[in-house]
């Protein structure tokens, strides 16, 4: 049993979403009205054709039109021309509105995505965001445009044809208005069952495809564990269910046309009988009856569209709600009135704590670290000890849940977010490059090619040991490097990311496992580039390979989100604590 309160709440929510969509149409109101007028012309033309046929049969053959051979053809041609122009105009104008709204919504979604906080990307996969911004919004507008056309054009068509029917024969129209809804109800029952069977069949087809995908993808496990019989049994069950659903669909689909034809014949028989009775009393003519039947048949299609509108309308509004949910995502807090031209780089972590969610264990707890300007501090510790979480707090990808972080004596929350991030360069093992030129990747953040300082790009490439590599590319610094730098080797991609950090020339540098995925030769080149980059910068280094951070000014060892120990490489080895244990394990392995 349905819940009336819940249904009312859902309906109210749909109205709210609909009103918000209408808000996007307000700037296009003039074009919108013009499109409605064009659709009204198309709808009115539906009622003209039965009238022309009526007059042709009653007056055209030996009647008052006999000497005017051009009359009916001229009317038909004129109606077709006007209808065609109006149809094109309505389609073009609605497409114009739809594409303008599409552009506006896409830009709003992309803007909100770019300015969303880091936890937004933890909740949403890249695939779901791509689907929403590129495909879902397009589908929503396509569905809602189609629904709008149905609501306006088909409603006006129904009105125009009903006016003609009442004008021609009001008695017969009243009888038809009783018969047609009954036929429509019976047909909707058949179609509803067919749609339900189609949905279930599609779900089963997807399940069967998944069984095939699993068996094909896991063929080694299937063969090694003798799972052929089990997989055959799984697939046989699915195939049998598919066969049964296909037969039920064949029955429902097969009944559809003959039942429709029978009901239409029954309705037509009733109408013909009544029309013949009327004809005997000179209440109708051949032309009037033919025009009436034609108008009645023309009425069926728009009525069917209007009765079927609820499903696509609901689907469109539901999808629109998901789009608005993305548009309404909160943006990163931009608070902070402190302005920094260029920071010295003095970083202080005061009793910093962080949790990823309410009720979860602390990822960081009571972190107290002072990093003087220009010092290199390495963060080491077992996986899950909080190293990456700690460095993610510096550019405010997340905000501490306890304590605070200071930059040059200012709490980072008091510094304008853009200015804070201008002070930080980041190089990670997960290199992110863009499908653009070498120069555009090095100078990433420049709004146009004119803003790129090419001399500075060349210096950055030289410092990253990439000058010779770039010279050998087809178009030098103007060579497109492909999706995520696929045209470059792993070491070259990493050095290009370092060149980007060098170009930015920020006073604070964060290195997150920057050499962990490289071979020995690439690591040597990248390490040399990193050493050049670290000179004069406050640097936080995360490293699993302890050999790469032995020369750090200080090493901080984290364990379970707390500082376990800190000191130089030699001091920590002498202390024989966690760091010394990790060091022994690594070098024993090597």
Swiss-Prot record:
Span-the-membrane segments of this chain are 31-51, 74-94, 132-152, 159-179, 259-279, 286-306
Entries under InterPro entries matching the protein? AAA+_ATPase (IPR003593), ABC1_TM_dom (IPR011527), ABC1_TM_sf (IPR036640), ABC_transporter-like_ATP-bd (IPR003439), ABC_transporter-like_CS (IPR017871), ABC_transpr_lipidA (IPR011917), P-loop_NTPase (IPR027417), Type_1_exporter (IPR039421)
A Gene Ontology cellular-component term = plasma membrane
Q: Which residues form the ABC transmembrane type-1 domain?
A: 33-315
Compartments (UniProt record) = Cell inner membrane
> How far does the signal peptide extend, from start to end residue?
none
Q: Which Gene3D superfamilies match?
A: ABC transporter type 1, transmembrane domain (1.20.1560.10), P-loop containing nucleotide triphosphate hydrolases (3.40.50.300)
Q: Is Hydrolase among this UniProt entry's keywords?
A: no
Alphabetized UniProt keyword annotations: ATP-binding, Cell inner membrane, Cell membrane, Lipid transport, Membrane, Nucleotide-binding, Translocase, Transmembrane, Transmembrane helix, Transport
Pfam families, alphabetized: ABC_membrane, ABC_tran
Specify which residues bind ATP according to the UniProt entry for this protein: 381-388
Q: Which PANTHER family match?
A: ATP-BINDING CASSETTE SUB-FAMILY B MEMBER 10, MITOCHONDRIAL, ATP-DEPENDENT PERMEASE MDL1, MITOCHONDRIAL
Domain writeup? In MsbA the ATP-binding domain (NBD) and the transmembrane domain (TMD) are fused.
- Family under the similarity heading: Belongs to the ABC transporter superfamily. Lipid exporter (TC 3.A.1.106) family.
Question: How is the quaternary structure described?
Answer: Homodimer.
The record describes the protein's role as: Involved in lipopolysaccharide (LPS) biosynthesis. Translocates lipid A-core from the inner to the outer leaflet of the inner membrane. Transmembrane domains (TMD) form a pore in the inner membrane and the ATP-binding domain (NBD) is responsible for energy generation.
Q: What is this protein called?
A: ATP-dependent lipid A-core flippase
From what organism does this protein derive? Cupriavidus pinatubonensis (strain JMP 134 / LMG 1197) (Cupriavidus necator (strain JMP 134))
């Amino acid at each position: 049993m349905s819940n009336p309160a819940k249904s009312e709440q859902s309906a109210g929510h749909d109205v709210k979403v609909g009103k918000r969509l209408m808000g996007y149409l307000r700037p296009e109101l003039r074009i919108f009205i013009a499109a409605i007028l064009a659709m009204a012309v198309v709808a009115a033309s539906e009622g003209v054709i039965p009238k022309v046929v009526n007059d042709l049969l009653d007056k055209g053959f030996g009647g008052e039109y006999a000497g005017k051979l051009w009359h009916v053809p001229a009317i038909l041609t004129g109606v077709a021309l006007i209808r065609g122009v109006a149809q094109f105009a309505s389609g073009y104008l609605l497409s114009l509105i739809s594409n303008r709204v599409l552009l506006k919504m896409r830009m709003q979604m992309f803007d909100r995505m770019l300015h969303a906080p880091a936890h937004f990307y933890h909740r949403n996969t890249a695939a779901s965001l791509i689907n929403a911004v590129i495909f879902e919004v397009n589908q929503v507008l396509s569905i809602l445009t189609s629904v709008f056309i149905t609501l306006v054009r088909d409603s006006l068509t129904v009105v125009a044809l009903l006016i003609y029917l009442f004008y021609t024969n009001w008695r017969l129209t009243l009888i038809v208005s009783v018969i047609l809804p009954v036929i429509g109800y019976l047909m909707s029952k058949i179609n509803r069952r067919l749609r339900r069977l189609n949905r279930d069949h599609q779900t089963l087809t997807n399940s069967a495809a998944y069984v095939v995908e699993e068996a094909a993808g896991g063929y080694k496990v299937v063969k090694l564990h003798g799972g052929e019989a089990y997989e055959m049994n799984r697939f046989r069950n699915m195939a049998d269910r598919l066969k049964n659903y296909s037969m039920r669909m064949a029955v429902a689909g097969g009944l559809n046309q003959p039942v429709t034809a029978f009901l239409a014949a029954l309705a037509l028989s009733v109408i013909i009988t009544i029309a013949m009775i009327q004809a005997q009393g000179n209440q109708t003519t051949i032309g009037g009856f033919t025009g009436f039947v034609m108008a009645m048949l023309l009425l069926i299609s728009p009525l069917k569209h209007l009765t079927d509108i609820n499903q696509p309308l609901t689907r469109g509004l539901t999808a629109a709600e998901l789009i608005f949910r993305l548009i309404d995502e909160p943006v990163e807090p931009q608070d902070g009135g402190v302005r920094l031209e260029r920071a010295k780089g003095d970083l202080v972590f005061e009793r910093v704590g962080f949790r990823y969610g309410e009720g979860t264990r602390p990822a960081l707890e009571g972190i107290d670290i002072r990093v003087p300007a220009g010092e290199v501090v390495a963060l080491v510790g077992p996986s899950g000890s909080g190293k990456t979480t700690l460095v993610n707090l510096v550019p405010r990808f997340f905000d501490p849940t306890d304590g605070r972080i200071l930059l040059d004596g200012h709490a980072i929350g008091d510094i304008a977010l853009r200015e804070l991030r201008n002070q930080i360069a980041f190089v990670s093992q997960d290199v992110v490059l863009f499908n653009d030129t070498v120069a555009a990747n090095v100078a990433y953040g420049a709004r146009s090619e004119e803003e790129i300082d090419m001399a500075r790009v060349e210096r950055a490439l030289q410092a990253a040991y990439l000058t010779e590599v770039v010279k050998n590319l087809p178009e030098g610094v103007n060579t497109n490097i492909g999706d995520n730098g696929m045209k470059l080797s792993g070491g070259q991609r990493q050095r290009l990311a370092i060149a980007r950090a060098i170009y930015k020339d920020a006073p604070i540098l964060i290195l997150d496992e920057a050499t962990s995925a490289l071979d020995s030769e690439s690591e040597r080149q990248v390490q040399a580039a990193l050493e050049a980059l670290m000179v004069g910068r406050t640097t936080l280094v995360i490293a699993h390979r302890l050999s790469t951070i032995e020369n750090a000014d200080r090493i901080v060892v984290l364990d379970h989100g707390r500082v376990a120990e800190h000191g130089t490489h030699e001091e920590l080895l002498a202390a024989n604590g966690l760091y010394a244990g990790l060091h022994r394990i690594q070098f024993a392995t090597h």
